[in-house]
């Protein structure tokens, strides 16, 4: 399937790296892929590249992009903020709407769910379906008062001391996050935003996730109308084997194909 590398610009002037996959068959719809924190538009292990290929083969046009401070996009790691990612998502949506007609769907992974869910009030009239992979829905439980081992290791007392003293901490020894982002975590509530929305949704989550709570996501999915939960049994965050990655991809493609058929 043809893949075109493009550049878009957020409203505050940050250049964003993006890719457009155009289906060669009859068009079912368009899907925007929104990656998690510390990775880029390929998503960990290239999952979004493989997902985009399978979606294009199934008749979907696909757009991927890297948030500011990630991949080849402009900005810095330390300058990553929730507000900035919301602006980047807005720019990516504009690219989708410039290239392809009609409503579109979003697949958002991990921290990508935060900007996506917070944007649902203005996305509502544009969005057809929503898929969340291992979504961060509770910022306090993930970052501020971490309940799981990955969060305790990366955002525990010693790391918080570094954040206070130096204005930043380093996640997994390789990605720098600044204090402004952590200040934002006290103000935003993506879980409430997800529960307030009525867009039909699929949540795909591993039940052995050590970074982002499976239980919080599962409860949200089960209490929300028009929402399906698919549990990847035994999987850690990001789907920790090729087999589990393939399961998440296959489930996502099949659900989107089915949903488009139901709505047509």
Language-model segments: residues:
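N-terminal cap/lid segment of alpha/beta-hydrolase-fold proteins
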Residues: 1-29
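Aromatic pocket-lining residues of Rossmann-like dinucleotide-binding sites
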Residues: 55, 119-120
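Glycine-rich nucleophile elbow surrounding the catalytic serine of serine-hydrolase chemistry
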Residues: 108-118
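Catalytic nucleophile-loop/oxyanion-hole region of alpha/beta-hydrolase
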Residues: 70-101
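Alpha/beta-hydrolase fold nucleophile elbow
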Residues: 99-110
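Short beta-to-alpha linker loops that shape the active-site pocket of alpha/beta-hydrolase fold enzymes
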Residues: 37, 61, 66-76, 136, ...
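Short, surface-exposed "cap/lid" segments of acyl-processing enzymes
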Residues: 24-66
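The alpha/beta-hydrolase serine catalytic core
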Residues: 5, 16, 114, 125-219, ...
């Amino acid at each position: 399937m043809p893949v075109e590398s493009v550049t878009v610009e957020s409203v505050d002037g940050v250049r964003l790296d993006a890719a457009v996959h155009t289906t060669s068959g009859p068009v079912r719809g368009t899907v925007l892929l929104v990656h998690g924190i510390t990775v880029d538009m390929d998503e960990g292990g290239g999952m979004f590249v493989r997902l985009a290929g399978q979606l294009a083969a199934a008749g979907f046009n696909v757009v991927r992009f890297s948030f500011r401070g990630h991949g080849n996009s402009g900005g810095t790691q330390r300058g990553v903020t929730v507000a900035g990612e919301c602006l980047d998502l807005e720019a990516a949506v504009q690219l989708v709407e410039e290239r392809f007609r009609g409503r579109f769907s979003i697949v958002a992974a991990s921290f990508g769910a935060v900007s996506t869910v917070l944007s649902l009030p203005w996305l509502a009239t544009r969005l057809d379906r929503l898929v969340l992979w291992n979504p961060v829905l509770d910022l306090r439980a993930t970052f501020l008062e971490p309940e799981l081992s990955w969060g305790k290791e990366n955002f525990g007392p010693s790391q918080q001391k570094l954040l206070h003293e130096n204005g930043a901490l380093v996640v997994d020894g390789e990605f720098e996050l600044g204090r402004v982002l952590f200040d934002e975590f006290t103000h935003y509530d993506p879980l409430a935003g997800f529960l307030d929305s009525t867009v039909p949704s699929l949540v795909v989550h591993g039940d052995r996730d050590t970074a982002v709570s499976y239980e919080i996501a599962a409860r949200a999915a089960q209490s929300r109308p028009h929402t399906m939960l698919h549990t990847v049994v035994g999987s850690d965050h990001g789907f920790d084997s090729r087999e589990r990655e393939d399961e998440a991809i296959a489930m996502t493609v099949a659900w989107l194909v089915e949903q488009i058929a139901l709505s047509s």
